[in-house]
């Protein structure tokens, strides 16, 4: 009976390790996406600075195009900020889930050790 319990604990351990690996991959993917967003935001800010540094006399059509472009850049920056906030929230959720899984794994390993000691005891 102890052997069966130990086998069950080992299967659970494998499942927990698989889940932890998957969570690690998801976190890595989120970090990569966050780096991409940060890079894109920097590009947009650079474009914004270039556009706002234009000097000289502009006609109505040129000014309208500039305003439209700046408005588009602003909405894109806002969209990226919202996406980054969502990524940060998801990272927090995954980190919490990962911590829970690590706790479960530690408990499982401790229980396995106890079962092994009971099995070896005369």
What are the language-model segments listed below?
Residues 1-122:
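Charge-rich amphipathic alpha-helical interaction elements
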